[in-house]
Amino acid sequence: MNYILIGVILGIVQGISEWIPISSKTQVLIVSSTLLGLSFNVAYSFGLFMEIGTIAAAIFYFRSEISGLLKALVRMSSRREDYLLLKFLVIVTIITGLVGVPLYLFVISLPILGLPMTVLGVVLLIDGIVIYLSRKNYFPRKGLHDLKLRDIIIVGIAQGLAALPGVSRSGMTTSALILLGVKPEEAFKLSFISLIPAALGAISVTVLFSKHEVSQAVHSVSLSGLLISIVVATFVSIFFINALLRFARTNKVVLLVIILGIMAIISGILSDIAKGFY
């Protein structure tokens, strides 16, 4: 198959699946194994490397928030929200690293698939039913300023678990925030911004510990194919970030939580199916 076409397909898969509760790693694993015949380790490393496109999309879409973060970092911001977001990202990223790096090193030798996402999906479905039954008394209303240290640590752990194949990073973090009572739009926004340092760290770890696999992956699809996949993933990601945030603003919490739950269960099932590819 033409490497340019492969790059476009992989870019679309990455750009869509990164932002919804279906593991982008698993989908890229399936596509790369089917189209390129890559082994598990090579395909997994390639999937993480492709997140360059989604990082670029997040930085572009949230450029105002990123600017505020940089100002807060050098103590030049006058906005309390910038410092709260900086604190949130620092803690979440540290916890993500402490949980995610050991899991990644473990995954290289022993792939674990869909169970975590399936369990999360069931929990979300139950939560959706609870919210519906108690909707007069309960509604996710928390914002960033309401999050306690314990809440932020939980989000970091949830994001770290996404190092496992079959576990969606956005699904874990968004779901954790909503289950903690954060309003949907804020939950999606915090989840998407959290991607930036987490994905940069994942790419660094991949290059550091899996140089051979990354080299094989790039060789399999060609450098031009890889670059095309990154560009396509960037543009597709921008579209999906905007669409998901617009949907979150509708405040259809019950529908949103149930959709997240169903997609998480589907992700778990797809991950188990993907086992046959490697």
Swiss-Prot record:
Where does the UniProt annotation locate this protein?
Cell membrane
Record field: catalytic activity = di-trans,octa-cis-undecaprenyl diphosphate + H2O = di-trans,octa-cis-undecaprenyl phosphate + phosphate + H(+)
- Key words of the record: Cell membrane, Hydrolase, Membrane, Transmembrane, Transmembrane helix
Look up and give the membrane topology term: Multi-pass membrane protein
GO CC term (a single one): plasma membrane
Query: Which residues are listed as membrane-spanning?
Result: 3-23, 42-62, 88-108, 112-132, 152-172, 190-210, 225-245, 253-273
The UniProt entry's GO biological process terms, in alphabetical order, are: peptidoglycan metabolic process
Q: Which domain of life is it from?
A: Archaea
Q: What GO molecular function annotation could you give as one example from this UniProt entry?
A: undecaprenyl-diphosphatase activity
EC number(s) per entry? 3.6.1.27
Q: What does this protein do?
A: Catalyzes the dephosphorylation of undecaprenyl diphosphate (UPP).
Please state which protein family the record places this protein in: Belongs to the UppP family.
Q: What is this protein called?
A: Undecaprenyl-diphosphatase
Q: Which organism is it from?
A: Saccharolobus solfataricus (strain ATCC 35092 / DSM 1617 / JCM 11322 / P2) (Sulfolobus solfataricus)
